[in-house]
Amino acid sequence: MSTEIKAQVVVLGAGPAGYSAAFRCADLGLDTVLVERYSTLGGVCLNVGCIPSKALLHVAKVIEEAKALAEHGIVFGEPQTDIDKIRTWKEKVITQLTGGLAGMAKGRKVKVVNGFGKFTGPNTLVVEGENGSTTVNFDNAIIAAGSRPIQLPFIPHDDARVWDSTDALELKSVPGRLLVMGGGIIGLEMGTVYHALGSQIDVVEMFDQVIPAADKDIVKVFTKRISKKFNLMLETKVTAVEAKEDGIYVSMEGKKAPAEPQRYDAVLVAIGRVPNGKLLDAGQAGVEVDERGFIRVDKQMRTNVPHIYAIGDIVGQPMLAHKGVHEGHVAAEVIAGKKHYFDPKVIPSIAYTEPEVAWVGLTEKEAKEKGISYETAVFPWAASGRAIASDCSDGMTKLIFDKETHRVIGGAIVGTNGGELLGEIGLAIEMGCDAEDIALTIHAHPTLHESVGLAAEVFEGSITDLPNPKAKKK
């Protein structure tokens, strides 16, 4: 069966970028169709990414904290885990949120069409679904088709013991020995979960540090902690993967490579994601897609075709849900006739590991590459009363300042709940705050959050929580 519908706006993809764009379009009075290949809204983030991983990381954190309390006189005994119940709870979290999105779409009168959409012309999109095809004739389109995990040709991805992030989040089993290929955020988060559930974790990373985008001093603190849990093989890469009856055998080369192939019960391939730009027949609409699958846009999220926009992972790095949401709002408002631009000063990044690693604005490496003269100020959590009382004193908060203006241009936090503490730094950069603005803002005590203010005091030379400050010249 085939049907044909008309819309002022069609949004292709219902992840955070897509549904946010569709809902904003509807709120602005535009007749909107939202196309989603899967049966639920929310995309990778809500269904097989951000949200389920945080549910499992919460479980992992509770397990680890229960064990750690034994050192302080509270002994719970060895945690007993019921994988089926954990999986059911994770699915309940997802269902609650996807159900909420479906309700909001209905309330806004956004028409949802399920199926795989492809362009057939500059104003037409055909969606192939289980119940036939739907042709959408549109005035404007927003492409929010997301990304997928990178696959390597020498890896037997058809073997059930070779996972991508989606497979890892299904929580079908807990392998005795798990290899995580890639020391980025996704791999480390999943390693954190499976270590807490009982797996032995090896992490192989080709660079000289995990989380390569973050500054070395921040990652050093993180690495010191996780080295007690994971076997880190840095400056090392996988050269061969062979599936045998008794396990997955992996050969490696590099600084930390074992001499012989290693047997694993499962291998998680977490080496990045590739955009879905080449899957949409966007060329039929005249939209240019580069060789990697990215779609280039301007600051109003327009592609080279003026009435077709693109947002989210498909337009480039960083591939983060919160970036896509803001891009979606911009695209919707531009279509509605408003003057709006995507021009953020900062986009925060967070690894929700334990400890968390979070940064926003420029890193030191980026400041150097841009030729910016800068200074840093660090407040160690070893001097934080709240951190000591909460048994997380190995963290640190770092601010990066323009040397001439003293304005904050970047910041990073490594420590428990670091991602929750990062917002002040991001806002400070957006608002053009200098060190004095932050230092003179009274922060509640005792909190981990006050470490941001104390780092600013370190820069100003006014801190009394550390010895021998050197006052800044005004």
Task: Identify the residue ranges that each predicted region occupies.
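Glycine-rich flavin
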Residues: 2-7, 17, 23-174, 207-211, ...
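Flexible, glycine-rich terminal cap/loop adjacent to redox cofactors
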Residues: 10-21, 26-38, 44, 51, ...
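Short hydrophobic core segments
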Residues: 10-12, 117, 136-146, 181, ...
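Conserved phosphate-binding and hydrolysis motifs of nucleotide-dependent enzymes
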Residues: 13-18, 146, 182-187, 272, ...
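Glycine-rich dinucleotide-binding loop and its adjacent helix/turn
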Residues: 50, 145-200, 204, 232, ...
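A Rossmann-like FAD-binding core segment of flavoenzymes
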Residues: 111-114, 118-129, 136, 198-299, ...
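FAD-site-proximal beta/loop scaffold in flavoenzymes
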Residues: 158-175, 261-335
